């Protein structure tokens, strides 16, 4: 069981998953960043709740100074903006509803200058009970081959201890990770057939639909050929001393996407949520420089490149179908294909999941989230 402590200036209480007098409200919250970099926090409560929401801010997701809220809003307003000119230090927020119920939330995306698709996978609800993935524990991204000075500072501020590099050996040799502040664990999963498709693109021999077929074959191969490597990567998450962990590949969408999907599956996160996380790569990959490189290619080649650089739910769905066809269920794939035992799944849940809603009923100086 993982204990995360949030120190309170005022007296606090014992934590409960529910309310001693009636049902605890269901509180959903989301944090976004606008074009300037300000944080926009939105929430909904069910049932409808009146009263005051107090907002607290911290550089870490599990320790908040409660001496002074950074913002207030009527609960019915459903949103508040935290204005900042700090685009280096990542912020997390604690929402207090009537000084009784508390939710933590962070922005999904981490702003970077030279790293594609860096995201926090905290805040995803498990199917069972009042638990969600913890913020600031696991990140996913593209390769770290080029880092600005600010990017290095941002990664340092995330306190990344371990980077799981899923790129093939040839990719690593051409573009080694530049971040030196973490332990790099290389678990190579090669991109098969990339030389052939690159040659056909250059020679103008690519046909409409070739990119789609190539990506479908890639995702099937994750199940048929690369389960050993993905299973090895999952074992890294079993050691709590490895956290926070960053999983990456070239763009952070395919190999990192499949591994993240399997990890979330092991945590009993609903498949619909897993698919949304996977598809979010389309919103966090900057294709402008790649589009410039493809400007002189024919229409079919440009379309193929667009396909190769995106995420398509049919690809991950195809992998899930292959898993269920070959193994009968995702649970059996986790145990037989990825060699993850039920006890190890419980360990992952103890490390990564925590209470999504904190209920405070009696005064105390410390809140313990378990």
Model region roles, listed by residue range:
Residues 12, 169-170, 366:
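Alpha-helix capping/helix-boundary segments
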Residues 252:
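Substrate/cofactor-recognition hotspot
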Residues 249:
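Short cysteine clusters
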Residues 20-246, 259-357:
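Cys-dependent protein tyrosine phosphatase-like superfamily
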Residues 3-9:
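Sec-dependent signal peptide recognition
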Residues 9-17:
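Bacterial N-terminal signal peptides
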Residues 358-370:
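Single conserved hydrophobic/aromatic residue that forms the stacking wall/gate
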């Amino acid at each position: 069981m993982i204990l995360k402590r949030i120190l309170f200036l005022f007296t606090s209480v014992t934590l409960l998953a529910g309310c001693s007098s009636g049902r605890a409200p269901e509180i959903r919250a989301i944090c976004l960043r606008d074009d300037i970099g300000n944080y926009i926090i939105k929430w909904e409560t069910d049932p409808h709740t009146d009263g005051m929401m107090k907002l607290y801010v911290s550089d870490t997701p599990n320790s908040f100074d409660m001496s002074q809220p950074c913002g207030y809003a009527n609960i019915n307003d459903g949103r508040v903006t935290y204005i900042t000119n700090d685009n280096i230090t990542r912020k997390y927020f604690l929402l207090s509803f009537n000084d009784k119920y508390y939710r933590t939330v962070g922005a999904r995306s981490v702003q970077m200058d030279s790293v594609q698709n860096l995201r926090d996978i905290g805040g995803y609800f498990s199917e069972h009970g009042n638990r969600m993935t913890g913020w600031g524990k696991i990140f996913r991204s593209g390769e770290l081959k080029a880092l600005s000075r600010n990017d290095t500072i941002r990664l340092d501020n995330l306190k990344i201890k371990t980077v799981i590099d899923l790129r093939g050996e040839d990719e690593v040799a051409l573009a080694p990770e530049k971040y030196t502040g973490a332990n790099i664990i290389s678990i190579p999963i090669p991109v098969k057939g990339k030389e052939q498709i690159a040659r056909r693109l250059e020679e103008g021999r690519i046909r409409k639909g070739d990119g789609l077929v190539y990506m479908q074959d890639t995702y099937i191969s994750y199940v048929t050929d690369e389960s050993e490597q993905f299973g090895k990567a999952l074992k890294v998450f079993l050691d709590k001393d490895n956290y926070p962990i960053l999983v990456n590949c070239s763009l952070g969408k395919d190999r990192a996407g499949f591994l993240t999907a399997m990890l979330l599956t092991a945590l009993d996160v609903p498949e619909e949520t897993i698919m949304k996380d996977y598809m979010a790569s389309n919103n966090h990959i900057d294709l402008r420089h790649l589009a410039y490189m493809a400007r002189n290619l024919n229409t079919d080649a440009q379309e193929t490149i667009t396909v190769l650089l995106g995420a398509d739910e049919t690809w991950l769905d195809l992998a899930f179908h292959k898993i269920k066809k070959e193994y009968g269920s995702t649970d059996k794939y986790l145990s037989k294909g990825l060699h993850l035992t039920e006890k190890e799944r419980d360990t992952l849940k103890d490390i990564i999941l925590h209470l999504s809603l904190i209920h405070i009923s009696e005064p105390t100086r410390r809140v313990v989230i378990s």
